[in-house]
């Protein structure tokens, strides 16, 4: 009787292999679940970081697009304003020309006020002392050039003008090339042989021509004289 109790007790205390497997399986399942959970967490963190990065980039691109749109709007506005100003200016200019033509009528003058006409040219005699280069610039400001003598008749006409006082000297547009010694007008053409300076100054400096009492003479270009400007007459009024 006592031996049976001991045997029964031993049978009760020794665990079976099936029970042992049941106890070990939960620990194995728990380890695999942890690995899966960790991988899922890493993937989620990666997706979250990617989403944040893409969100930042999208915000930056959106800001650049908005900035470019604002610049385009400003440029369009400036262009519209410029176009409107040009139209307004053109309209005002055309209206002014129309009013001028209506008021002038038959009073069309081929030369500006106080200029003297001869054929297709207008002349103005400046009675102030200037060097040749300075007088050339003064004529350019008037839309003209220094007087170019194309014929004896033209020189006689200029000499007959009452403003050309006897004895005064007036620069004209002829000068001597320092290398070749040839004479040229401002436009690059050469004077006629009978219109070359009669009295020629010999000097190391540049030599230019001036008119005195119907005679063309040469002198140093840095000397001071009066001068005569010439421009084309208005073709519609000739």
UniProtKB/Swiss-Prot annotation:
For the Cytoplasmic compartment, the record's topological domain ranges are 1-35
Q: What happens when the gene is disrupted?
A: Deficient mice shown no alteration of dendritic cell phenotype and numbers and the response of dendritic cells to innate stimuli is not altered. No alterations are found in leukocyte numbers or frequencies in spleen, lymph node or thymus, and mice appear normal and do not develop any obvious symptoms of autoimmune disease.
Name the cystine pairs: 111-122, 139-229, 208-221
Compartments (UniProt record): Membrane
Q: Which residues cross the membrane?
A: 36-56
The entry annotates sugar attachment on 81, 133
Q: How does it sit in the membrane?
A: Single-pass type II membrane protein
Superkingdom to which the source organism belongs? Eukaryota
Q: Which residues form a coiled coil?
A: none
* Annotated C-type lectin domain residues: 118-230
Keywords from UniProt, A to Z, are: Disulfide bond, Glycoprotein, Lectin, Membrane, Receptor, Signal-anchor, Transmembrane, Transmembrane helix
GO biological-process terms attached to the record: positive regulation of cytokine production; receptor-mediated endocytosis
Residue span of motif ITAM-like: 5-10
Q: Which GO terms describe its cellular component?
A: cell surface; membrane
What GO MF terms are annotated? Answer: carbohydrate binding
Known tissue expression: Isoform 4 expressed at high levels by CD8(+) dendritic cells (DCs), and at low levels by plasmacytoid DCs but not by other hematopoietic cells.
For this protein, the record's Gene3D superfamilies field holds: Mannose-Binding Protein A, subunit A (3.10.100.10)
Extracellular topological domain: 57-238
Quote the subunit structure annotation: Isoform 1: Monomer. Isoform 4: Homodimer.
**UniProt function note:** Functions as an endocytic receptor on a small subset of myeloid cells specialized for the uptake and processing of material from dead cells. Recognizes filamentous form of actin in association with particular actin-binding domains of cytoskeletal proteins, including spectrin, exposed when cell membranes are damaged, and mediate the cross-presentation of dead-cell associated antigens in a Syk-dependent manner.
Q: What is this protein called?
A: C-type lectin domain family 9 member A
Task: Supply the source organism for this entry.
Answer: Mus musculus
Source taxonomy: Eukaryota, Metazoa, Chordata, Craniata, Vertebrata
Gene (UniProt): Clec9a
């Amino acid at each position: 009787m006592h031996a049976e109790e001991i045997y029964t007790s031993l049978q009760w205390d020794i665990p079976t292999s099936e029970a042992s497997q049941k106890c070990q399986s939960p620990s194995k399942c728990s380890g695999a679940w942890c690995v899966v959970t960790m991988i899922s967490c890493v993937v989620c963190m990666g997706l979250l970081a990617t989403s944040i990065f893409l969100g930042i980039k999208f915000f930056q691109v959106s800001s650049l697009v908005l900035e470019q749109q604002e610049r385009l709007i400003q440029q369009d506005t400036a262009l519209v304003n410029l176009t409107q100003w040009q139209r307004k200016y053109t309209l005002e200019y055309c209206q002014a020309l129309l009013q001028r033509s209506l008021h002038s009528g038959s009073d069309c003058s081929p030369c500006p006020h106080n200029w003297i006409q001869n054929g297709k040219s207008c002349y103005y005699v400046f009675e102030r002392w200037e060097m040749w280069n300075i007088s050339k610039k003064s004529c350019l400001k008037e839309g003209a050039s220094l007087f170019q003598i194309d014929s004896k008749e033209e020189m006689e006409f200029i000499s007959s003008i009452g403003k050309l006082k006897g004895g005064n000297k007036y620069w004209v547009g002829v000068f001597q090339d320092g290398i070749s010694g040839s004479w040229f007008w401002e436009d690059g053409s050469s004077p006629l042989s009978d219109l070359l300076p009669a009295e020629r100054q010999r000097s190391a400096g540049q030599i230019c021509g001036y008119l005195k009492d119907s005679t063309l003479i040469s002198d140093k270009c840095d000397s001071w004289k009066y001068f005569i400007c010439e421009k084309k007459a208005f073709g519609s009024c000739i």
